[in-house]
Curated annotation (Swiss-Prot):
MF annotations from Gene Ontology: structural constituent of ribosome
PROSITE patterns xrefs: RIBOSOMAL_S2_2
The gene coding this protein: rps0
Swiss-Prot/TrEMBL GO biological process terms: ribosomal small subunit assembly; translation
Family recorded in the similarity comment: Belongs to the universal ribosomal protein uS2 family.
Subcellular localization(s) per the UniProt record: Cytoplasm
Pfam families: 40S_SA_C, Ribosomal_S2
Region (Disordered): 278-300
Name by which UniProt lists this protein: Small ribosomal subunit protein uS2
Length: 300
């Protein structure tokens, strides 16, 4: 990492550098835009451009000082059309008081005053200059300064402050937004001093796949579900499935008093007669005579 040009109070800690490296904020694209060359550290043999983490931290501090200079936090507009940054900008807006636009940027938000979504921000922060090109273009029409998270191949036209970082990874995007929010709160005095840890975890700024979360929740419900609860009802679940469901052999026609007797009813005399017969009755004789009677009345 190159020597820092910041005052000693703004120097990053060892933990900050390790977090930036763990989130792969230093891994850029294989293509390199000419205006991003000052932020290049080296190029790996496989062609991947490695960004300078020291420059990334310097630009995070510079962007935070610009944000703090805005009197009304609501005049700051944070934008992310990339899905990996939508959760991050919403969390950043909730912690700093900025206005978030997560998702598609409606053309005319900054230039067409007739639309209901018309805004006049004093500062615009975007996640990716390529996907948020419409917002940057409209900001240039109305002279709004722009701060952007720029990769090695990101276009920097009409970008006033470029934060060199990996703006395609979900962890890299979330971590940079988290560090930017923490630095803003430090400069505003919300955090007592720079040694005070922020109680908000970086995981809150990371992207979460809704389908993966839904599948995880459904898998947990299926594991906690008792087998057969939907088929037999809650009564059988309460009994613990202790009843005998299948009966075969000579006892197929027997009906025990323990399973059939209701509370307060005396069925003992009847049960002894039912079980007294040694021969298993099939029941075909009794039903056959009754079923044959309607056959004689087919003539009208």
């Amino acid at each position: 990492m190159a020597p820092s040009n910041l005052p000693a109070i703004f120097n990053p800690t060892q933990q900050d550098i390790e977090m930036l490296l763990a989130a792969q904020c230093h891994l850029g694209a294989k293509n390199l835009q000419v205006h991003m060359e000052p932020y290049l550290w080296k190029t790996r043999p496989d062609g991947v451009n490695v960004l300078n983490i020291g420059k990334t931290w310097e630009k995070i501090v510079l962007a935070a000082r610009i944000i703090v200079a805005i009197d009304n936090p609501a005049d700051i507009c944070v934008i992310s059309a990339r899905p990996y940054g939508q959760r991050a900008v919403l969390k950043f807006a909730s912690h700093t008081g900025a206005t978030a636009i997560a998702g598609r940027f409606t053309p005319g938000n900054f230039t067409n005053y007739i639309t209901r979504s018309f805004r006049e921000p004093r500062l615009v922060i975007v996640t990716d200059p390529r996907t948020d090109a419409q917002a940057i273009k409209e900001a240039s029409y109305v002279n709004i300064p722009v701060i952007a998270l720029c990769d090695g191949d990101s276009p920097t036209e009409y970008v006033d402050v470029a934060i060199p970082t990996n703006n395609k990874g979900r962890h890299a995007i979330g971590l940079v937004w988290w560090m930017l929010a923490r630095e803003v709160l430090r400069l505003r005095g919300t955090l007592a001093n720079r040694e005070t840890e922020w109680d908000v975890m970086t995981d809150l700024y990371f992207y979460r796949d809704p389908e993966a979360e839904e599948n995880k929740d459904s898998a947990g419900v299926e594991e906690a579900k008792v087998p057969g609860a939907d088929e037999v009802g809650p009564a059988a679940v309460a009994d613990g499935f202790t009843s005998e469901w299948e009966v075969s052999g000579a006892s197929a026609g027997a009906f025990t008093a323990q399973a059939a007797a209701a509370p307060g009813a005396s069925w003992d005399a009847d049960t002894t007669d039912w079980a007294a017969s040694g021969e298993a009755q099939t029941g075909n004789e009794g039903w056959g005579t009754e079923a044959a009677a309607p056959a004689a009345t087919t003539q009208w």
